[in-house]
């Protein structure tokens, strides 16, 4: 390049310098370099325009360092490198890369004092540039590595709604391995117990979250009663087996899969049969108690309601017999009093005939008239209580609708228990046939 080219390019470079770059050129580091330098070419105004004047170039021609550095004795390339000393600092300010590309190669500096100072400057200024790039690359690697688990969790988020987790596939083996200190035969019986109850009470094609909560709770309570040592894992075992059934159905496998050989044994089958029989007896006992309690509560409510109705009828229709009921000594020798005591449960039903008898003797409160009235009238109305007593036991022998429904539930429970025992017997028989 000619000197005119450097002259035409330098004003553009001078105009592109910002005030912040001027301050950097006036920094203590640059001032220190200006004091050590014998020439006045680097101590200009900082815009690089004065270094291209002929007077300045003539003043620096006597310095032997400049011919060594520039090679051709021209001052302009050295001035360009002097202006380029600010380029590493300008890189921190994120200047366009075109400016950085315009810097000449540093080995062009000679072995003079200015060349050494420029190398020291570039060496010092390049050190703060490398940590941002190295740390930036390290941060980017950290960001990429830390982003990987987040991407995995985001990818697995939709599978949580499926209600079919893949990590439960090997739950049967896990249950067998983590049973330290427990009877393995009882653990096998517990697993088969859960399988039987889930097959009997739950729909295996419906997700476990949509199953009736009362049925699941009933199975858990049954497991807690028969296998108290495994009550903490009952819910998880039910969930695992139900999901495995759903997966097998989705994969096109048979619903009624046989029990794996490593999960069953003759002793476990015996424990299972005993647990099923015990649970059946306890279920029947609970149903009988519920029926008994419901049957006891209902007659009490019916008696209270009937007594209220009869008392209301007596007080509204027959006002005088209310005072005659308080005269108990009058009926001491009469046979009617025995009918009240003999039919204590039917006393409320016999109140209207008694009111009819005492209504005839409301005018004569004396003992003779009452005895005569009682003796004369006792022959006529006596068939009435007997007729009522014979006609009343028919409704009492009938069952209420609630009792009938309770009995039907008991019958259904017996049939279900019988079917369950029948299936257990068939499975035991098949097991014997398989072993033989």
From Swiss-Prot:
UniProt xrefs under InterPro entries = HTH_NOL4, NOL4/NOL4L
User: Highest taxon of the source?
Assistant: Eukaryota
Question: What is the taxonomic lineage of the source species?
Answer: Eukaryota, Metazoa, Chordata, Craniata, Vertebrata
**Bias (Polar residues) ranges:** 351-366
Q: What is this protein called?
A: Nucleolar protein 4-like
Positions carrying Phosphoserine: 130, 295
Q: Give me the ranges of the annotated region Disordered.
A: 1-184, 351-400
Underlying gene: NOL4L
Biased composition (Low complexity) is annotated at 41-61, 375-396
Q: Where is the composition biased (Acidic residues)?
A: 160-169
Q: Where in the sequence does UniProt note compositional bias of the Basic and acidic residues kind?
A: 170-184
Keywords from the UniProt entry: Phosphoprotein
